[in-house]
Amino acid sequence: MIGRITGLLLEKHPPLVLVDVQGTGYEIDVPMSTFCKLPDIGKKVTLHTHFWVREDVHLLFGFMTEQERALFRQLTKISGIGARTGLAILSGLSVTDLHQAVVSQDSIRLTKIPGIGKKTAERLLLELRDKIDPVAILSEAGAAASNVDKDILSALLALGYNGREVNRALEQLSEGVTVSDGIMQSLKFLSKVK
C-alpha cells in the first residue's frame, strides 16, 4: 500500500498530476480541491494517497489532507460510489461543505455534482449520516463555535433532534446566550417548527 508520496511535481493536467520520487514518476489522480492547492511545477509536494486496485486497473489517488483521503475512503464504500464519483464529489464540495450537507441532510447540494442523481445523493446522506460528528462540523465551519454552541448542540442531539433541525435552531439564537437559555430558546423554536 502506498500511503503518502513526497517528490517533485513534474506535470499538472487536471485531474492528473505527475510526481517524481527519486527518478520514478507516479501518475496520481487528485480532486480539484487538492489540485488548486498544489505548488508550482518543479516544487516539492506531499500527497496522502489511496492505492485503488481492481481486476483491470491500478490507480493512485492523492489528497492534500488526511481528512480528504479519509472521506474519499468513506465515500467509495457506499454502493454506487466508485473512485471517479468519489473524486467528483470531493472536487465539487470541500470536506467541510460535504460534512455540512450530511448533517443538514441537504441532497440538493449533492445533486449539483455531475454524476450524482437524487437517489445516489439520498443514499450517500443516509450512509454517511451516522459517521459524521455534528460537533466537529460546527468547529470545522469556523462558525465561531463557542463552547456554549457546542453544549447546546450536544444537548439537542441527545434529545433526539436531527442535525438539520439543530442547525436551524442554533442560527436563531441571540448573541451571548447562556447554555440553559440557548437550550430553552432552541426548544421553543423547534416546538413551533414541528
Swiss-Prot record:
It is found in: Cytoplasm. The keyword Magnesium does not apply. Residues 140-143 are annotated as: Flexible linker. Gene3D superfamilies: 5' to 3' exonuclease, C-terminal subdomain, Nucleic acid-binding proteins. Residues 1-64 are annotated as: Domain I. Residues 144-194 are annotated as: Domain III. The RuvA-RuvB-RuvC complex processes Holliday junction (HJ) DNA during genetic recombination and DNA repair, while the RuvA-RuvB complex plays an important role in the rescue of blocked DNA replication forks via replication fork reversal (RFR). RuvA specifically binds to HJ cruciform DNA, conferring on it an open structure. The RuvB hexamer acts as an ATP-dependent pump, pulling dsDNA into and through the RuvAB complex. HJ branch migration allows RuvC to scan DNA until it finds its consensus sequence, where it cleaves and resolves the cruciform DNA. This is Holliday junction branch migration complex subunit RuvA.
